[in-house]
Amino acid sequence: MSLGRYIGWSILAFTYLVLAILLRLIFLQPSKTSRASYRPKDAKCSLGVFLGSGGHTSEMKALLSTLDYERYQPRTYIYCHGDDLSLRAVSDIESSKGGLISSKMYYLLSLPRARRVGQPLLSTMVSVLKTLYIAALRLFLIPLLKNPRRPFVDLLIVNGPGTCVVLVLVSYIRRVRLEYTRIIYVESFARVKSLSLSGKMIRPLADRFLVQWPDASDSDNVIHKGLLV
């Protein structure tokens, strides 16, 4: 990929972000719950799931094992380019429901990875902006043009790593007098006494922030639910 295209992506991503922040400041709501709409318990709910590869994908697979597929449809599985493990996990998750018609109600969405292990800081900034641009296009702009009243998904579940921070930021843009995506973050089983960096960044934005160990729940808006995986 040429440097010119990287710069172009960076400029577009930065423009999206600045515009979103300005809109958010102009139309800031008194509280997040003021836009919450009533949803009957048996109503259909579109679901977005981020599969972060490796252990994150394995934990998410366990979290979804008891999912009510009749209610949560359609489902969109978001994964990073080249993550074959997560693609196999999607196949396993969906096939576990056997012959249910609803188990076919799912889609796949591939995004560039925001950061790779050991990646230098400068190139990380470029890759994050690239991911932000693609995510803003696919999760915010295109759905907004298709149907301004409906978000990309009704509910987004994430558990790390870094790319999920970009997804949450983009999903949060709609909280400007629009129906928005509810966000649930589940901290990794491995985080026993403290939150991950992704968790610390997402905590102020999540509607529900769940941890699996009591020592990791260090504030009022963190919910300890015990072991979930």
Curated annotation (Swiss-Prot):
It is a single-pass membrane protein. The keyword Nucleus applies. The gene is ALG14. The keyword Ligase does not apply. Keywords: Endoplasmic reticulum, Membrane, Nucleus, Transmembrane, Transmembrane helix. GO terms for biological process: dolichol-linked oligosaccharide biosynthetic process. Belongs to the ALG14 family. Heterodimer with ALG13 to form a functional enzyme. InterPro entries: Oligosacch_biosynth_Alg14 (IPR013969). One of its GO terms (molecular function) is N-acetylglucosaminyldiphosphodolichol N-acetylglucosaminyltransferase activity. Residues 28-229 are cytoplasmic. Residues 1-6 are lumenal. It comes from Cryptococcus neoformans var. neoformans serotype D (strain B-3501A) (Filobasidiella neoformans). This is UDP-N-acetylglucosamine transferase subunit ALG14. One of its GO terms (cellular component) is nuclear membrane. The chain crosses the membrane at residues 7-27. It holds the Pfam family Alg14. Involved in protein N-glycosylation. Essential for the second step of the dolichol-linked oligosaccharide pathway. Anchors the catalytic subunit ALG13 to the ER. It is found in: Endoplasmic reticulum membrane; Nucleus membrane.
